[in-house]
Each structure stands twice: as C-alpha cells, then as structure tokens.
C-alpha cells in the first residue's frame, strides 16, 4: 500500500501518483471504479494525500 502524492483528472477517470524507491509510479481508475469503491472523485483530486493505493488489488483506501 502506497501513500498517494498527487492526482490528475483524465477524460474518463483519475490517475494517481506515488513514489516508490525514488521512482514516480501511477495507476489510473475510471469513474465507475471510483463509484464502486465509494471514492469521491472531487475529494481525490483536491486532497490526494488523504488516500492510499493498493496496486495489487487495484483499490484506493481513504486514510483521513
């Protein structure tokens, strides 16, 4: 599980970024996936550091 450092709006979803071993990594989530995980897309864009990403499970976790 990795702490998200930033996020960016895409045409059909949001891409999140994190640092792993000094390298910037990313994973994208479409809006349907975000709704299914009960993630507020606007909150993810405005407060990305409140979230963690589990790349293996392709999930976002709120860490407020």
Task: Annotate the PLM regions.
Residues 2-34, 38:
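N-terminal acidic leader/helix
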Residues 36-64:
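Mixed-charge, Lys/Arg-enriched low-complexity segments
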